[in-house]
């Protein structure tokens, strides 16, 4: 990290720590109606619960997917779950978008997290003694995202990281990092999933069609 940028990265991180909890309602609802969870969220929540319970194996989750399929919403739902259901302090959860981080010259994911630990937790990757959750959006703006994620989660067993990015990140990850990460592609909703999310209507379309074809 360029030392001249420390004030900028400090202000950026302080804003993320302070403002993200206040933005949850706007990010997770429309006209007062809270968004339902995708099935993908339920899978990710399992890894989170295991980590909180002391299992530190599956801590590096990567969510590739097309723009607009709901990756950012999942990250905010994870934040909300940690804060309001698991009683994790907001100081232990960091959300940021690499698209915004990219506006700070010579600043990447790895340097940002090192600065975050040093400045806001008086710690380092090697000495961190509390559980932290990193929710990193739009990782494709950092060409070294996969290696950074690997190093961060390798050096600290107390960090749980979820990283999202465009579908292209499927082709960009470091070979060594690929052995450590869990890739969970976020795909466009099918019709059943759309009904569940938008109208809270649960149905198995395939079974309904079979029943209609054979039973009229």
Where on the chain are the PLM-derived regions?
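Short glycine-rich substrate-engagement loop in P-loop NTPases that contacts/grips substrate
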Residues: 94-129
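Walker A/P-loop nucleotide-binding motif
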Residues: 57-76
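Conserved P-loop NTPase "ATPase switch" module shared by AAA+ and STAND
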Residues: 124-145
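P-loop NTPase Walker A phosphate-binding motif
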Residues: 72-90
């Amino acid at each position: 990290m360029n030392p001249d940028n420390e004030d900028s990265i400090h202000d950026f991180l302080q804003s993320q720590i302070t403002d993200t909890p206040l933005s949850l309602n706007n990010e997770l609802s429309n006209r007062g109606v809270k968004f339902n969870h995708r099935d993908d969220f339920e899978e990710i929540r399992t890894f989170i619960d295991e980590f909180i319970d002391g299992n530190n194996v599956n801590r590096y989750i990567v969510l590739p997917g097309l723009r607009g399929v709901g990756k950012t919403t999942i990250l905010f739902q994870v934040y909300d779950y940690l804060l309001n259901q698991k009683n994790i302090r907001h100081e232990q959860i960091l959300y940021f978008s690499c698209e915004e981080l990219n506006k700070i010259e010579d600043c990447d994911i790895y340097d940002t997290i090192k600065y975050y630990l040093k400045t806001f937790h008086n710690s380092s990757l090697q000495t961190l003694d509390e559980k932290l959750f990193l929710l990193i959006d739009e990782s494709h703006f950092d060409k070294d995202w996969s290696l950074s994620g690997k190093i961060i989660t390798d050096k600290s067993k107390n960090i749980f990281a979820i990283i999202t990015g465009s579908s292209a990140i499927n082709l960009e990850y470091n070979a060594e990092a690929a052995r450590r990460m869990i890739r969970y592609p976020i795909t466009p909703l099918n019709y059943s999933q759309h009904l569940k999310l938008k109208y809270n209507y649960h149905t198995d379309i395939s079974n309904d069609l079979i029943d209609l074809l054979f039973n009229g």
